[in-house]
């Protein structure tokens, strides 16, 4: 197959074709340096300028106040499951967690392994198909932060609200939703996101952290590479950053601006998800486990009424250029991820195929 396909993968995800073409054109000789972006030293003026431009673009998109630091860190977002408690919990502190899916469950267990954590609510017994009703939760007096995952990539559930924390810093794993919908940064103490959904290619984690959370040095002492303050003090240059990822992220930030900004993309994302859910709700051939009020806009999880047809569905979808629809290995089933770069044409093509498949196999 020579043409581009529709990649519904949860990550690495689809990137805008125009960005890929720009990167291709610049690959051998970036900004007339005679070198590829992959070859340029990270402390050169060119790369320092690139990081500064990327940070400023992200600040403009999200209206990030000056008292928040933006960090571009190498590695998987999953590393934050350990870095957050190691940096934010001091002796005698507790952390509170909402367990609403696989990723928040993993984060909770990692925090408990290293420090002390408790959960405010767990939806595991119900199968991670809903979000706890909004209420005033009782926080322990020694709670240093409250952690939640606004969008659970694996389970396809989304918080329809921002939890109230009574002044306790709110920490959010926004790996699969950052830049897909408007947020108020001031409601959070720390936000992190892996890049491979809506930001860039895999290997970069963006952290946005309030300066007050950097004031107290961790106790006991932690490795220097895991200390947020070290990265903030060195403007993401404490060690070699993932330069190519930051380069793509900078292009992605500018692409979002050209599309009309985050609000415009949010409207598109809502329309894409609504169209797919509307089709799923119209047929008994496909099943959607998540309660309607908790459905993700980014990750639409579903299954077949006849599960033995799943592999046939995936094989035929692949032949139609509809890729990566297999659900996560922890949950099974099917999943269509509708990140910013997925056009409505991709959703239309998927619905057309699903309708034909249901008629032929129902």
Curated annotation (Swiss-Prot):
Cofactor, free-text remark: Binds 1 pyridoxal phosphate per subunit.
Cellular localization per UniProt: Cytoplasm
Binding site for pyridoxal 5'-phosphate: 77-78, 103, 153, 173, 196
Catalysed reactions, as listed in the record: O-phospho-L-serine + 2-oxoglutarate = 3-phosphooxypyruvate + L-glutamate; 4-(phosphooxy)-L-threonine + 2-oxoglutarate = (R)-3-hydroxy-2-oxo-4-phosphooxybutanoate + L-glutamate
N6-(pyridoxal phosphate)lysine PTM sites in chain numbering: 197
Binding site for L-glutamate: 43
Involved pathway(s): Amino-acid biosynthesis; L-serine biosynthesis; L-serine from 3-phospho-D-glycerate: step 2/3; Cofactor biosynthesis; pyridoxine 5'-phosphate biosynthesis; pyridoxine 5'-phosphate from D-erythrose 4-phosphate: step 3/5
GO annotation terms (biological process): L-serine biosynthetic process; pyridoxine biosynthetic process
GO cellular component: cytoplasm
S-adenosyl-L-methionine listed as a keyword: no
Function: Catalyzes the reversible conversion of 3-phosphohydroxypyruvate to phosphoserine and of 3-hydroxy-2-oxo-4-phosphonooxybutanoate to phosphohydroxythreonine.
Similarity annotation: Belongs to the class-V pyridoxal-phosphate-dependent aminotransferase family. SerC subfamily.
Stated name of the protein: Phosphoserine aminotransferase
Lineage, uppermost ranks: Bacteria, Pseudomonadati, Pseudomonadota, Gammaproteobacteria, Legionellales
């Amino acid at each position: 197959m020579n043409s581009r396909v529709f990649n519904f993968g949860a990550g690495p995800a689809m990137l805008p074709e125009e960005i890929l073409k720009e990167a291709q054109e610049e690959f051998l000789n970036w900004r007339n340096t005679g070198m590829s972006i992959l070859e340029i030293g990270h402390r050169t003026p060119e790369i320092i300028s690139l990081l500064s431009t990327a940070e400023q673009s992200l600040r403009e998109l999200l209206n990030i106040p000056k008292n928040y630091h933006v960090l571009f860190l190498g590695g998987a977002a999953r590393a934050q499951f350990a870095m957050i408690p190691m940096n934010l919990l001091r002796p005698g502190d507790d952390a509170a967690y909402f367990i609403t899916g696989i990723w928040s469950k993993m984060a909770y267990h990692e925090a408990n392994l290293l420090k002390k954590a408790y959960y405010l609510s767990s939806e595991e017994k119900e199968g991670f198909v809903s979000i706890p009703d909004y209420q005033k939760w009782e926080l322990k007096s020694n709670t240093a932060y409250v952690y939640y995952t606004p969008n659970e990539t694996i389970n396809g559930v989304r918080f329809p609200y921002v939890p109230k924390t009574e002044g306790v810093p709110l920490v959010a794993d926004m790996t699969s939703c950052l830049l897909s919908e408007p947020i108020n940064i001031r409601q959070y103490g720390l936000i992190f996101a892996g890049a491979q959904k809506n930001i860039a290619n895999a290997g970069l984690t963006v952290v946005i952290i309030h300066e007050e959370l950097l004031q107290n040095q961790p106790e006991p002492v932690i490795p220097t590479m895991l200390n947020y303050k070290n990265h903030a003090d060195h403007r993401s240059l404490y060690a070699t950053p993932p330069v190519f990822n930051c380069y793509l992220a900078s292009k992605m930030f500018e692409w979002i601006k050209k599309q009309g900004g985050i609000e415009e993309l949010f409207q598109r994302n809502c329309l894409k998800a609504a169209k797919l859910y509307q089709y799923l709700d119209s047929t008994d051939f496909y099943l959607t486990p998540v309660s309607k009020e908790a459905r993700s806009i980014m990750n639409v999880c579903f299954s077949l009424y006849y599960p033995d047809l799943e592999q046939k569905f995936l094989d035929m979808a692949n032949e139609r250029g509809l890729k990566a629809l297999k659900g996560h290995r922890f949950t099974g089933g099917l999943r269509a991820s509708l990140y910013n770069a997925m056009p409505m044409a991709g959703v239309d093509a998927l619905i057309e195929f699903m309708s034909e498949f249901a008629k032929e196999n129902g």
